[in-house]
Every structure is written in C-alpha cells, then in structure tokens.
Amino acid sequence: GLGRATRNVVSDTLLEQFPPDEIEAILAHEAAHQAHRDLWRMMALEVGMGYLMAFLVSRVAPVMVTWSRRWTGVDSLEDVASVPIVGLATMLAGIILAPIGAANSRAIERQADRFALEVTRNGFAYASALRRIAAKSLADPFPPRLVRIVLATHPPILERIAMAEAYNSKNANG
C-alpha cells in the first residue's frame, strides 16, 4: 500500500507452514521494501519507462508505417488501420525496455535480501525459508540466462540461498 495503507499481511499458510525464525526472515525482507520505499522507486521507474516507451513508439511507428505501406495499404498514423502497427511498435518497445525494469526489480530484491540478513542476523533461517518457498513454487530454480535477464523480477532462488549461506559463513568466521 501507499502512505498510511502500507501493510505487510501475514497469511495463515505462512503461519502454519513456516517456523517462527523463517517467518521473521520473510517479514524482514518485506519490511525492507517499506523501509527503502521500493514501491515508490518502482513507480517512478515505470513512469519514466512509460515516457521512454512513448518516445520510442513515436519514432518507430512512423518508420513501420512507411516500411509496411506496400503490404498494409496504410499511408499514415492518422489512418485507424494503423492501430495494429502502433500496437506492434509498442510491443517491440516493451520488449526492448523489459530488461531495464527486470534488472531494477532484481536489484531491489537483492537489497531486501541483504536487509533481511542484517536485521535478523540469521542466514540459516533465511536460506531455509527460501528453500521452503522454492519447494512449494513452480518457479524454475535454473532459469535460462535470457529469461533471467529479460523477464526475471527476482534473482534466481539458488543465488538467493547461496547469498544467505555466504552470510552465515562470513559471520561465523568474522
């Protein structure tokens, strides 16, 4: 939520299927999003990307109309028949911009993971919670590189587990 409506909701499934130390780690991760105002950061990026998308479409769509004139019979963006061409230009711009939003989201999630580890000081619990989430999830633990770069909004679960385990090792030795 925004403003006074900001809340973390704890589901009965979480309470029933996760031990308290893992719930604490999960809530610390979610609290990080509030502490860092991640929703506002993501909204600002999306607005900026919306303007960038509109700019790209304004440049690409006229070129596409000219290029496709022979096949479509569309001479101008003022022709209602150009709507599918504008739609295609919008889709292409979205594909081009998708990795930017995904990379930003992954960076925010990594930051929230680090916050959870620093607040709870319990990488064991966080790694265990992530393993439990992975076991219940249908997400691919080894997504292809292209999927990770273009579409993934979270780092791969195994990378996150490794980070939590590294936190344990680092703090056990230092």
Describe the predicted segments one by one.
Residues 80-91:
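Short, contiguous hydrophobic alpha-helices characteristic of membrane insertion segments
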